[in-house]
Amino acid sequence: MTPPKLRASLSPSLLLLLSGCLLAAARREKGAASNVAEPVPGPTGGSSGRFLSPEQHACSWQLLLPAPEAAAGSELALRCQSPDGARHQCAYRGHPERCAAYAARRAHFWKQVLGGLRKKRRPCHDPAPLQARLCAGKKGHGAELRLVPRASPPARPTVAGFAGESKPRARNRGRTRERASGPAAGTPPPQSAPPKENPSERKTNEGKRKAALVPNEERPMGTGPDPDGLDGNAELTETYCAEKWHSLCNFFVNFWNG
């Protein structure tokens, strides 16, 4: 067993050692927290809350304030859900410390900012800045909070890894479809219908055809053409002239018929 004098000498040293360890741990925690944005008490004593916009958008907000050494300003993060179920996320950022009255009346500043936020019909789509009446005018220049533009989603890579190759592929598909829907290779083109004739043209053509067919029908088969009408003159001579006047009569008949 240790004597009573030794116990009395060890107790103060143990207390000092424990207190030193506690102080070192507290300093470490404070240093780690200085690099991360910490919640700031809002007008109702909390760092977050909920509200309903005039167009029935259910929104929740969270207020974050960076460390004094950080260059980024304060951020008011929002998450809203529209009546049709669509969800939106956005944030308002600014530097309220540029207002001279912010350090002394910080809670009043955020109360006025949140009041202006609740009046917006669509908080995540209204680009109007949020400004407290406490810091209106030149004394609060740069202290307003502005809507952060939302980043567009990255383009989806194609199979080959290049987004520009998707359009030519779509064009080639359209051409193959046109070829498939067109006439098959090797098939003759459809014959065009003959042009329609007018009734007057039909009658003229039919008359010409009949005139061309009549001489062929009246001419007996096996007989050739009758050049200069000599056969007809001979028949007239034999019919109307006697044998002794046959040559003279034939001469006059040929002369008359010319």
Swiss-Prot record:
Location(s), subcellular: Secreted
Residues spanning the signal sequence: 1-26
Region (Disordered): 146-231
Amino acid composition bias (Pro residues), ranges on this chain: 186-197
Keywords: Disulfide bond, Growth factor binding, Heparin-binding, Secreted, Signal
Biased composition (Basic and acidic residues): 198-209
SS bond partners: 59-80, 90-124, 241-249
Pfam families cross-referenced by the UniProt entry: FGF-BP1
GO cellular component: collagen-containing extracellular matrix; extracellular region
GO biological process: cell-cell signaling; positive regulation of fibroblast growth factor receptor signaling pathway; positive regulation of vascular permeability
A GO term, aspect molecular function: growth factor binding
Alphabetized PANTHER family for the sequence: FGF BINDING PROTEIN-RELATED, FIBROBLAST GROWTH FACTOR-BINDING PROTEIN 3
Family note: Belongs to the fibroblast growth factor-binding protein family.
SUBUNIT field: Interacts with FGF2.
Role noted for this protein: Heparin-binding protein which binds to FGF2, prevents binding of FGF2 to heparin and probably inhibits immobilization of FGF2 on extracellular matrix glycosaminoglycans, allowing its release and subsequent activation of FGFR signaling which leads to increased vascular permeability.
Identification of the protein by name: Fibroblast growth factor-binding protein 3
Species: Homo sapiens
